[in-house]
């Protein structure tokens, strides 16, 4: 018998995302990536049920837990998991080629402190993660949707920050990075209006975030980078 608790039993209701922040298309998968999804998913992947996940059972320990939303090919997750084996890392991604790439690397390196979820972060946060269960959340280079008419598709909106507030432990943190100044300004505006978060540091490149190949290419083209870190209030 399942002992999971539904949203309704937690006194919450499911709030569908008003509009998605991603386009459901993905590049071609290599044969190795397809094979990884078939054979390595049971080891590193998390299949979602109807209630919140038991993260202690999934990782077989109690540890600091960090969530990365939209991890791409998993480069930053891998670097952080290597550097901090005492931490557990969750990654959410909608694109299967990136997931397949990460699974292959996990097997090759023998890392056991990463688990992967395939799905929409909005739904995963609402349905699968207990309140509060995360010590930190990171979102690196989310789609900026640069055209003004598409700004409503940007992930960082007041309703999404409300959701994060429930999932991040008091005293935990929220770290974003973007190479679009306009998006950085929107993020600051949204978070500044939220009582649950306080901005922590300046906006230069963070030494606490791995520098990825994607970021390096952008900087070679003259793109700036805005790192924004916020602390989850202990009083809200």
From Swiss-Prot:
Its EC number is 2.1.1.33. S-adenosyl-L-methionine binds at residues 68, 93, 120, 143. GO terms for molecular function: tRNA (guanine(46)-N7)-methyltransferase activity. Substrate binds at residues 147, 179, 212-215. InterPro entries: SAM-dependent_MTases_sf, tRNA_(Gua-N-7)_MeTrfase_Trmb, tRNA_methyltr_TrmB_bact. The gene is trmB. Belongs to the class I-like SAM-binding methyltransferase superfamily. TrmB family. PANTHER family: 3-DEOXY-D-MANNO-OCTULOSONIC-ACID TRANSFERASE/TRNA GUANINE-N 7 - -METHYLTRANSFERASE, PENTACOTRIPEPTIDE-REPEAT REGION OF PRORP DOMAIN-CONTAINING PROTEIN. It holds the Pfam family Methyltransf_4. The keyword Transferase applies. It comes from the Bacteria. It is an enzyme of class 2 (transferase). The active site is at 143. Pathway: tRNA modification; N(7)-methylguanine-tRNA biosynthesis. This is tRNA (guanine-N(7)-)-methyltransferase. Keywords: Methyltransferase, S-adenosyl-L-methionine, Transferase, tRNA processing. Catalyzes the formation of N(7)-methylguanine at position 46 (m7G46) in tRNA.
């Amino acid at each position: 018998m399942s002992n999971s608790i539904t949203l309704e039993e937690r006194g919450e209701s499911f709030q569908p995302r008003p509009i998605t922040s991603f386009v459901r298309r993905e590049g071609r998968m290599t044969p190795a990536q397809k094979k990884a999804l078939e054979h390595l998913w049971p080891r590193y992947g998390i299949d979602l049920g109807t209630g919140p996940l038991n993260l202690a059972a999934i990782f077989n320990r109690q540890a600091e837990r960090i969530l990365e939303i939209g991890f791409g090919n998993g480069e930053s997750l891998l670097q952080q998991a290597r550097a901090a084996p005492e931490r557990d890392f969750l990654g959410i991604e909608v694109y299967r080629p990136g997931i397949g790439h990460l699974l292959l690397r996990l097997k090759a390196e023998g890392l056991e402190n990463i688990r992967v979820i395939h799905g929409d972060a909005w739904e995963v946060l609402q349905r699968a993660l207990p309140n509060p269960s995360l010590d930190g959340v990171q979102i690196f280079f989310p789609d900026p949707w640069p055209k003004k008419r598409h700004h409503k598709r940007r992930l960082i909106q007041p309703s999404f920050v409300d959701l994060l507030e429930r999932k991040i432990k008091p005293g935990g943190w929220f770290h974003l990075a973007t190479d679009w100044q306009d998006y950085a300004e929107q993020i600051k505006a949204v978070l500044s209006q939220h009582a649950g978060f306080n901005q922590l540091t300046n906006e230069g490149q963070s030494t606490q975030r791995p520098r990825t190949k994607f970021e390096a290419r952008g900087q070679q083209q003259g793109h700036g980078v805005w790192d924004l870190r916020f602390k989850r209030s202990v009083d809200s």
